[in-house]
Every structure is written in structure tokens, then in C-alpha cells.
Amino acid sequence: MNTEEAIELITQNYSASEGSLIFSLHERNTFSSRQFWDLYDSIDTVVNASHHNDQLTEQISSCYQAILKMLIWHFDAKDLFTIECLPYDYPWYIDCLDYAVLAYYRKNPEILKSAGRDNAVKRYIDCLDKGSIPWSRMFTAYGTAENYCELLSALEQTTDIEQWEKNYNRLSDFEHQSTLFPPAPFVLVFLVRILQQLLRNGNADAIVKKLLDRFLYYAGLCNTAESMDHAEPLRQFSDLLNDENLLPEDYIEEDLLKIYEDPDAISDQLFYSFYYYAKIVLSEVPDILDYYKCYPDESKELRRRTENIPL
């Protein structure tokens, strides 16, 4: 994002133009993490470009106050205003915005770095879009994950336990015999989002219990992997999608057979990363359960199994 694009995006939020975070909050009562990070990036860009003027200052200040006000109203029992899809850890987003605005006013980009709020892993999870993941280039226990996007969409749209389990079982081969495969951390991102959706709507208790049972199981696998000698994980979650870590675009059956038959076909670093990033994703679940004041026993056990995660 260059300075001109950043200023334009700030102006769009100031004007509550369609597609901006403030438009979504005010007109659609919806919080979009992607739109939040777009606004955050725009402020960060003008800070690093040392671009300041009275008009921009007014726009940033107005956007900041409007966002805070709408988030506060979300908890006003006397107000009919309600924000859908508000993340359980919304104060963290407010903190991020606080530091961005403070950095602008003080003309000091180091504030953002020293604050340690720009967490790359959490941000990556926030903005992950299942439609942009190369599922067909990830191997599973029985082939590839080419149909995972459609199956995850089906899981999002059903509250019937029998149909849900049927679809879930079709994508459950990201784990087999206590082994996680490349799609695992990515699938878990969307399963955690489905959990939040179900808790927010207050329905499908049977599905919630099914998810929590599986989350506990996967967290246990991650702990087992962590307790053994292992390589360092890949530096970034997104590195899992680097070309060298995926199947060739024109892969053939022999490519899959080599992976299944040759224990050295996958590096120790890549293999451990499946567990490392899966555990990071699962570490968010206890706070989600606590936010919705439900399933305290599962929350306690999941927290025990996912503690000491740098998220």
C-alpha cells in the first residue's frame, strides 16, 4: 500500500463509504477483521511516510472515535445497536488501533514496533480466506484436500448433527492415526470460526460438543509432538503455503506415493510446523468459550493443553 492508497482508504472510512470498516459497523452492524487491518495498514503507512496535515488528522481522529463508540455501544443494553461477528478478543483490536493512532500523533513509527501489537500469526489467521488456500496441493491421509473448501462451506451452513458429521468425516483425513497432515492448521482455523458462529447463534449444542471433543484430541496430539525431539517450526504460518512446501501444481500419483512411502520426503521442520501452528489456532478456543460463558470444563482442559503458546 502506498501513501496515496492509504490516504484514500482513510478518507473512505471517514466518509463511511461502502466497503470500509466504518460502513460495515454502522450500516451493516458487522465487524470485518480484514477491513480493520486495511484501516490499520493505512494509518501505519502514513506514519512511516511521515505524512501529516490537518485534514488527515481530522479524518483519523474521527474514524478512531467512531469505531470506539460503536464497539462500546455493542454492550449498551439500552441501545438496539448490535455488532455481529464481533471477535471475543475485540479489546485487542482496540489496542492495535490505539497504538496506530498514537504513532500518528507522535509521528513515531517505533511505537508500533515497541508495543508488540502487530502479531503476524494472529493477523494471518484473521485474514485467512478458505477460497484462497491451495487445498488441491496439500496431501492428506488418503489423497489431497481438493474438496475441503466446499466441505467447510457445507459445515458452516448446517446445524443438523447427522449431516454435519457426514461432511466433517469427509474432511477428517487431515488427521490419521495420531498424525497431522498439511491441511490441519488451516482446517482448524475455519472450524474455530464455525465454533464461534454456533456459540454466537446459541444453537447446535451437539455440534459444539463434537467440535470441542475433536479440539481436545488434536491439542493432545500437538502436545505429544511438542514433547518429543523436533525441529524448529517454520518462521511464519504463511510459510506452510510456500511453493516448496506444497505438491507440484501438475502433481501425479507418483508424487503422492513418494510422500507416503519415503519418510524423508517431508522435512522435519515442515512436519513439526503442522502441529505447532495447529496448537496456536487451538489456543484461542478457551478464551472463546470463556467469552460466551459456556463449557467451563472443556475450556479449562483446552487451556491446560494449549498453554505457553506465543499468540
Question: Which residues does each PLM region occupy?
Answer:
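Alpha-helical solenoid scaffolds in large eukaryotic transport, assembly, and signaling factors
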Residues: 42, 123-228, 232
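Conserved hydrophobic register position within alpha-solenoid helical repeats
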Residues: 60, 163-170, 208-215, 270, ...
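N-terminal low-complexity, intrinsically disordered segments
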Residues: 1-41, 54-85, 135-180, 186
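Amphipathic alpha-helical binding modules
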Residues: 66-120, 214-218, 268, 284-310
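Long, helix-rich interaction regions
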Residues: 118, 122-123, 220-311
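Amphipathic alpha-helical interface surfaces
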Residues: 39-42, 93, 100, 187
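Alpha-helical repeat scaffolds in large eukaryotic proteins
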Residues: 26, 41-51, 65-76, 98, ...
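Amphipathic protein-protein interaction modules
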Residues: 44-98, 203, 215-227, 261-272, ...
